[in-house]
């Protein structure tokens, strides 16, 4: 192969096997695995598809990729039509491969297939199954019952929603639903629903309720559907209905319960003590609404922000209280402090150092120092520390200070603000016992004096500090456009926007100003002239109308 030919193949290449297309097939059998560039392969649409264009080929482009010039679209099945007493659900469309589903209206049974697919039949496509039929459901003769009968004995057949009613013989009680109806199960078969009733002789025993007494309904013998009313004894509350009924199974229902109408068992709150006076006893009972107060033991604090109380609730339970959590003292820095001895006052807690703990420690000078953990989580006389220097001074917004690599006791730093900001607070702070004092100042934005024409400011200064508020008052004869009160914001601007004071226009002059604005908006002199003529005519008509009104008024007086 020549060098030119090799380069040609390397640059343009060949095409591999053509892709498998779901909608088209090669027009002839192919045994090749690669194809020269510019090769054209003829294709035909697969069964179920029809041509959508004249070109039906694959073309091998010079770069070794196939270009698809085939357009085949799915064939469409005919509309299946409407299903009497049912419906046809089209899942997507009527195209090849699509599916439709058939279902019957309530009370009808489907005879035939419930689905049909658009499939290949011969050279075209058609539905796999014909339109089914929906026929009304029918039930057999209603079942007979012992000691009773139904009213449908004269009927020959029963269709969907037909019903019959049962009646018991004398001295028997009907249990269940007196009427049953012809229904459809699984859209395939007609059945009677619900189950037919039964006719029984029912007697219930003498009713008893713990901590309750019968209030009404006394009888020697209780039969089915007889009722009794109960009331609870003093100190108990009724849970459920106070009226019970003799049921079909010979029992009473619903069973009432008389519960103690108070809270009991004072809750034990972790790490807290009860302070309610007089002090309650464990065996006491507490009406709904009773409040018990607790206080955290030394070295503990409330676990939440809720009050340290529990309340006897309407459901006769005590409200929840998380109790108290430990207050731990901070752990001394092990890099600078050497703890010699640690005496734990209360071993059973999760704190490294807890209320009452005492530590003995030394610094580089080997002087023995002691500190005790207090109940509020602080050390006395101070947190064990050997540091004499301070951390970096606090950074402030829009301000700066001269930085240093270290800050020892009595070191001072001075803050200054950026241009456009004013320093509020002490400019100089000092390092004192590992803390900066006093608090760092703030740099607040400065706003320029608002320019107000025809008005005055409540506070007249050249500059205003951030958050400062100013009130604007317009001169007599002028009205304010905007907010009367404005505030200097953190970006050095006034918020809301500075208002304006404009001359108040009497109502009689409004049409004059409107005419003036109209003249300013007209594009050329001819339009202005025309507008003036119209305006003049309008004024003359108004003047004439005034004269007519005046004449009418004179005539009335005469």
Swiss-Prot record:
Entry's Gene Ontology cellular component terms: acrosomal matrix; acrosomal vesicle; cell body; cytoplasmic vesicle; extracellular space; outer acrosomal membrane; plasma membrane; zona pellucida receptor complex
Its annotated compartments are: Secreted
Q: Which CDD domains match?
A: CCP (cd00033)
Query: Domain named Sushi: which ranges?
Result: 14-74, 75-136, 137-201, 202-260, 261-326, 327-388, 389-445, 446-503
The glycosylation sites are: 31, 177, 186, 469, 491
- Answer whether the UniProt record assigns the keyword NADP to this protein: no
Can you name this protein? C4b-binding protein alpha chain
Q: Which organism is it from?
A: Rattus norvegicus (Rat)
Phylogenetic classification of the source organism: Eukaryota, Metazoa, Chordata, Craniata, Vertebrata
Q: Which gene encodes it?
A: C4bpa
């Amino acid at each position: 192969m020549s060098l030119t030919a090799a380069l040609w193949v390397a640059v343009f290449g060949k095409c591999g096997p053509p892709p498998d297309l779901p909608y088209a097939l090669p027009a002839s059998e192919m045994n090749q695995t690669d194809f020269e560039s510019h090769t054209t392969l003829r294709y035909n649409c697969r069964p179920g598809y029809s041509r959508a264009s004249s070109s039906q080929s694959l073309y091998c482009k010079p770069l070794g990729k196939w270009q698809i010039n085939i357009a085949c679209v799915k064939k469409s099945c005919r509309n299946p039509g409407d299903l009497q007493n049912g419906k046809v659900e089209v899942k997507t469309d009527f195209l090849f491969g699509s599916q439709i589903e058939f279902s019957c209206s309530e009370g009808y049974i489907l005879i035939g297939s419930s689905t049909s697919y658009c499939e290949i039949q011969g050279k075209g496509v058609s539905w796999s199954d014909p339109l089914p039929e929906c026929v009304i459901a029918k039930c057999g003769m209603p079942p007979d019952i012992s000691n009773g009968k139904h009213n449908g004995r004269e009927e020959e057949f029963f269709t969907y929603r037909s019903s019959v009613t049962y009646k018991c013989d004398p001295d028997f009680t009907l249990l269940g639903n007196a009427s049953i109806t012809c229904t459809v199960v699984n859209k395939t078969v007609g059945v009677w629903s619900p189950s037919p009733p039964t006719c029984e002789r029912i007697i219930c025993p003498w009713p008893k309720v713990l901590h309750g007494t019968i209030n009404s309904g006394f009888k020697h013998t209780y039969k089915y559907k007889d009722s009794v009313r109960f009331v609870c004894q003093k100190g108990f509350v009724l849970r459920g209905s106070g009226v019970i009924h003799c049921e079909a199974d010979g029992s009473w229902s619903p069973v009432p319960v008389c519960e103690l109408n108070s809270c009991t068992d004072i809750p034990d709150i972790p790490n807290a003590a009860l302070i309610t006076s007089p002090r309650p006893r464990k065996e006491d009972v507490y009406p709904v609404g009773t409040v018990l107060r607790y206080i955290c033991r030394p070295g503990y604090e409330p676990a939440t922000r809720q009050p340290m109380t529990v309340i006897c609730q309407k459901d006769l339970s005590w409200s929840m209280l998380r109790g108290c959590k430990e207050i731990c003292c901070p752990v001394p820095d092990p890099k600078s402090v050497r703890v010699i001895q640690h005496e734990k006052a209360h071993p059973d807690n999760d704190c490294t150092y807890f209320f009452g703990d005492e530590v003995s420690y030394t610094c580089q000078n080997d002087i023995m120092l002691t500190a005790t953990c207090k109940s509020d989580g602080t050390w006395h006389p101070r947190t064990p520390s050997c540091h004499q220097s301070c951390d970096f001074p606090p950074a402030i917004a829009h301000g700066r200070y001269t930085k240093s690599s270290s800050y020892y006791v009595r070191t001072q730093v001075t803050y200054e603000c950026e241009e456009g900001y004013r320093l509020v607070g002490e400019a100089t702070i000092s390092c004192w016992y590992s803390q900066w004092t006093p608090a760092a100042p703030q740099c607040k934005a400065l706003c320029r004096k608002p320019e107000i024409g025809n008005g005055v400011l409540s506070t007249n200064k050249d500059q205003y500090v951030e958050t400062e508020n100013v009130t604007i008052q317009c001169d007599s004869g002028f009205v304010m456009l905007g907010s009367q009160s404005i505030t200097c914001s953190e970006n050095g601007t006034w918020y809301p926007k500075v208002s304006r004071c404009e001359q108040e226009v009497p109502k009689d002059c409004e049409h004059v100003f409107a005419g003036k604005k109209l003249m300013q908006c007209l594009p050329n002199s001819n339009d202005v002239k025309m507008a003036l003529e119209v305006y003049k005519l309008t004024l003359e008509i108004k003047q004439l109308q005034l004269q007519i009104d005046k004449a009418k008024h004179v005539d009335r007086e005469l």
